[in-house]
From Swiss-Prot:
Regions of compositional bias (Basic and acidic residues) in chain numbering: 139-151
Annotated region described as Disordered, given as residue ranges: 93-151
Protein name as it appears in the record: Small heat shock protein hspG6
Domain (sHSP) ranges: 34-210
Keyword Transport attributed: no
Matching Pfam families: HSP20
Length: 210
């Protein structure tokens, strides 16, 4: 019969003290989605007389960005820790998205000038006007970026962001667990997963002969 020590031993062997290098080894690049795992959140696993408790630290992460599933006896906790933007950065993002959507809508609408352009050949002066306008727009965008860079001065940058993923192999004790009783709670950056144990369980299945 597997014990909680078997799980912890497997957990420690797989994660190797949560080193970042081992994170890349244990959580390789997903070939289909090209996702790189940047973080390996710390985890505590506790087995009581009636339940299995899994606690994972996910500080600074919204619950909407966390995914939990069990597949082939493997519990997977994954998601993304996104960087928060300040008010100035948020305003720039909104302005850029608004300006791009406005330009797209204008391009979709036919104008009288477009019909005239189809009839009349374009002159060199028209081409010069278009290129001048494009150059001016590019300069304005660069000036906005330079303003943002000049106002943001970071003295210390120790926080990490990006995708995270954590595995827990439940193969040795899965027969003891009632998967229909899984309960999750996310509070103050701590994700707690509780799985009740079955009242009656056995790792041996008796087969009758007909």
């Amino acid at each position: 019969m597997a014990t909680i020590f078997d799980i912890l031993n497997t957990l420690n062997n797989n994660n190797n003290n949560n080193n970042f290098e081992n994170c890349k080894r244990q959580c390789p690049i997903n070939k289909s989605n090209k996702t790189i795992i940047d973080k390996l959140p710390p985890m505590d696993v506790t087995m009581t007389n009636d339940k299995l408790i899994i606690e994972t630290e996910l500080a600074g992460i919204s619950k909407d960005h966390i995914e939990i599933d069990i597949k082939d006896s493997i519990l997977t906790i994954q998601g993304e820790k996104k960087k928060n933007l300040n008010k100035q950065q948020q305003q720039l993002v909104i302005e850029k998205s608004t300006s791009s959507s406005t330009l797209d809508s204008k391009e979709d609408e036919p104008s009288i000038e477009e019909f005239e352009d189809d009839i009349k050949p374009k002159s060199k002066s028209d081409n010069t006007t278009v290129s001048t306008t494009t150059t001016a727009t590019t300069k304005e965008n660069k000036e906005d970026e330079n303003k943002t860079k000049s106002t943001d001065k970071k003295f210390i940058s120790e926080r990490s962001f990006g995708n995270f993923k954590r595995y827990l192999d439940l193969t040795k004790i899965l027969y003891q667990l009632d998967l229909n009783s899984i309960n999750t709670q996310f509070e103050n950056g701590l994700l707690t997963i509780t799985i009740n144990k079955k009242l009656h369980y056995s790792n041996t299945i008796k087969i009758n002969i007909n």
